[in-house]
Amino acid sequence: MKIVLQNNEQDCLLACYSMILGYFGRDVAIHELYSGEMIPPDGLSVSYLKNINMKHQVSMHVYKTDKKNSPNKIFYPKMLPVIIQWNDNHFVVVTKIYRKNVTLIDPAIGKVKYNYNDFMKKFSGYIITLSPNSSFTKKKRISEIIFPLKKIFKNRNTFLYIFSLFISQIVALWFSIILRDILNKSHDITYSFIMMISLVLFQTLSLLMKLGAQKNTNLLYESKISRQIFKGIFSRPLLYFRNNSVGTIIEKINLRTGIRDGILLKIFPSLLNFFTVFIVIIYLGTISFTLTLFLVIMNLLYMIFSFSLISIKRQANIQYTQQTIDFTSVVQEDLNQIEQIKAQANEKECVKRWTKKSAQTIFSYNKILNIDGITSAFNQGFNYICVILMMIFGIYLNQGNLVSIPDLIIFQSGISLFVSAVNQIQDVMFEISRLSIYGNKISDLLIENPQRIDNIEKHSNNAIILKDISYSYELNNYIFNNINFSIKKGEKIAIVGKSGSGKSTLFNILLGLISYEGEVTYGYENLRQIIGVVSQNMNLRKGSLIENIVSNNNSEELDIQKINDVLKDVNMLELVDSLPQKIFSQLFENGKNLSGGQIQRLLIAKSLLNNNKFIFWDEPFSSLDNQNRIHIYKNVLENPDYKSQTIIMISHHLDVLKYVDRVIYIDDKKIMIDKHNNLLLNDSYNSFVNE
């Protein structure tokens, strides 16, 4: 069964689902199983699973089994493979049941074996079976990375690279021939010296060709793969980034270099070296057919043993790769919560969690080291045995004048070459498997999502118009259904409602960050260039203060008076002027040399600058005290200097309601929009604001 690794903890069941579909002959990637832009907030519900079952023409059954029975009594061969719940919060695929062991594929780490006792400790008791319907059709899928890889490696650069490797192999063989001729005294010193100079020249030529081809291929790889991955990432909807941790996305991005290096540095050289061996065999056969046959037989025996280790090493590498990704995700998650960890003195728990995850990574890495150690020890032992047997056999042939001593030296070199070729073929098979996994993990990033085209009516008096807008995480389970309203240019709007009512969802619809049903029309030309945003997750970058608040900080074009006016309106001018270099002072990464409230006020200033006309604020006052908050209410929301700028905000500070033109109130999936005083006549709104 083809192994499919999960992208994150949330889609482990989808990874298992993908593996079962692949077993039946329908090759479907995890990202193709997503219904929309993300897994619903409440997880993989029954309706969600029913939809993908219908789409992929399979039937699903869920069983609760008695855990008192042993695995061979719970699972019978014909029902395998099946999905089971694991540790109460995870899913895996059971593939084989043996007398004492169970083989399963964990989408977090790959294929693993458990004895009955350990298996039953982790098995939660729930079994999910999938079976094809009568309408089920098989489907082969070509990974999205295959086509761009062909473009990169099917060209002149690859030919030059392979040719340079071929020259290098020929030089190595040529060296052995020259050495044999010197020992046989076949040529004089002058001839031998000329041959040595020629070897150096050809080796240098090979190196120059190789470096040139590698550099050109790297540039092509960057333009075809890396750039496409970057475009694919930024074409993803906002919900994609909420469904995947920063650590997971970074790890997936970094896999691209592993694919390039695996092809250039391992697969190509190894394949060429293996094929060069056949030339060596032909040459050695002309010296002594008997010794060549002996050499081939010995290396076939070596190959049989070595190849038995490939699957074990491949699985160990899968585990190590996934464990590394998991460890990075845990570290990223904890570091994002460092303030809470410090405040609650949870450092010991974090150290314990990191240590456990790191130990799992080291355990997987040690398995690779063990396999490499066994392989290395066997290689050395085989070399010793093979050389000794070759010498014993060769001396016997030498006594019969069938081979010379220099010939034996050539055959000794042949042993090393053969062993190296077999090892490299192992590496090729290992790399192909590894790169297949890497390719599948980043395949979704190579797909550029089509972008919604904003509907613009630039001469409209409205900043935005919503017509028959509906939104749902799941089919027919609508958060909003057929909502209609408009906001005029220059209006200041506050969105309020109880927690979980859908404020952020509506905010993201207005901003065009999530998909929806219906039509949104904007009243601004070049909309995306004149939008200012303050979100809960925004922060400052490392660099000067001016670089953080002004998009074009060309000193000749800076309107210092305008910048100072805005900084004064958000109550930051006095602080900025107290800095050594004022607005040109340097900020640390994430603005760590400022307080949370100062960062928030600078972000508000940034949203108001840069010729922005349509402003969106999501909880912009969460870190501000009453004094600074009221200052912004009076100096921005009520300031005629900002009358042409439309501001839409979410805020849990209800004192802002007296300073805005209208309020959008969300209650039980319904939307009311009116002036604050008019909405107070509504019992639900009145109760909400006076709680």
Curated annotation (Swiss-Prot):
<dbReference type="GO" id="GO:0016887">
    <property type="term" value="F:ATP hydrolysis activity"/>
</dbReference>
<dbReference type="GO" id="GO:0005524">
    <property type="term" value="F:ATP binding"/>
</dbReference>
<feature type="domain" description="ABC transmembrane type-1">
    <location>
        <begin position="158"/>
        <end position="434"/>
    </location>
</feature>
<dbReference type="InterPro" id="IPR036640">
    <property type="entry name" value="ABC1_TM_sf"/>
</dbReference>
<keyword id="KW-0547">Nucleotide-binding</keyword>
<feature type="transmembrane region" description="Helical">
    <location>
        <begin position="262"/>
        <end position="284"/>
    </location>
</feature>
<dbReference type="InterPro" id="IPR039421">
    <property type="entry name" value="Type_1_exporter"/>
</dbReference>
<feature type="transmembrane region" description="Helical">
    <location>
        <begin position="189"/>
        <end position="209"/>
    </location>
</feature>
<comment type="function">
    <text>Probably implicated in the export process of the lantibiotic lacticin-481/lactococcin-DR.</text>
</comment>
<keyword id="KW-0812">Transmembrane</keyword>
<feature type="domain" description="ABC transporter">
    <location>
        <begin position="464"/>
        <end position="689"/>
    </location>
</feature>
<feature type="active site">
    <location>
        <position position="12"/>
    </location>
</feature>
<dbReference type="InterPro" id="IPR005074">
    <property type="entry name" value="Peptidase_C39"/>
</dbReference>
<keyword id="KW-1003">Cell membrane</keyword>
<feature type="transmembrane region" description="Helical">
    <location>
        <begin position="159"/>
        <end position="179"/>
    </location>
</feature>
<feature type="domain" description="Peptidase C39">
    <location>
        <begin position="6"/>
        <end position="130"/>
    </location>
</feature>
<dbReference type="InterPro" id="IPR033839">
    <property type="entry name" value="Lacticin_481_peptidase"/>
</dbReference>
<keyword id="KW-1278">Translocase</keyword>
<dbReference type="InterPro" id="IPR003593">
    <property type="entry name" value="AAA+_ATPase"/>
</dbReference>
<dbReference type="GO" id="GO:0140359">
    <property type="term" value="F:ABC-type transporter activity"/>
</dbReference>
<keyword id="KW-0080">Bacteriocin transport</keyword>
<dbReference type="InterPro" id="IPR003439">
    <property type="entry name" value="ABC_transporter-like_ATP-bd"/>
</dbReference>
<keyword id="KW-0813">Transport</keyword>
<feature type="transmembrane region" description="Helical">
    <location>
        <begin position="289"/>
        <end position="311"/>
    </location>
</feature>
<dbReference type="GO" id="GO:0008234">
    <property type="term" value="F:cysteine-type peptidase activity"/>
</dbReference>
<keyword id="KW-0472">Membrane</keyword>
<dbReference type="GO" id="GO:0034040">
    <property type="term" value="F:ATPase-coupled lipid transmembrane transporter activity"/>
</dbReference>
<dbReference type="GO" id="GO:0043213">
    <property type="term" value="P:bacteriocin transport"/>
</dbReference>
<dbReference type="GO" id="GO:0005886">
    <property type="term" value="C:plasma membrane"/>
</dbReference>
<dbReference type="GO" id="GO:0015031">
    <property type="term" value="P:protein transport"/>
</dbReference>
<dbReference type="Pfam" id="PF00664">
    <property type="entry name" value="ABC_membrane"/>
</dbReference>
<dbReference type="InterPro" id="IPR011527">
    <property type="entry name" value="ABC1_TM_dom"/>
</dbReference>
<dbReference type="InterPro" id="IPR017871">
    <property type="entry name" value="ABC_transporter-like_CS"/>
</dbReference>
<keyword id="KW-0378">Hydrolase</keyword>
<keyword id="KW-0788">Thiol protease</keyword>
<keyword id="KW-0067">ATP-binding</keyword>
<feature type="binding site">
    <location>
        <begin position="497"/>
        <end position="504"/>
    </location>
    <ligand>
        <name>ATP</name>
    </ligand>
</feature>
<dbReference type="Pfam" id="PF00005">
    <property type="entry name" value="ABC_tran"/>
</dbReference>
<feature type="transmembrane region" description="Helical">
    <location>
        <begin position="385"/>
        <end position="405"/>
    </location>
</feature>
<protein>
    <recommendedName>
        <fullName>Lacticin-481/lactococcin-DR transport/processing ATP-binding protein lcnDR3</fullName>
        <ecNumber>3.4.22.-</ecNumber>
        <ecNumber>7.-.-.-</ecNumber>
    </recommendedName>
</protein>
<comment type="similarity">
    <text>Belongs to the ABC transporter superfamily.</text>
</comment>
<dbReference type="Pfam" id="PF03412">
    <property type="entry name" value="Peptidase_C39"/>
</dbReference>
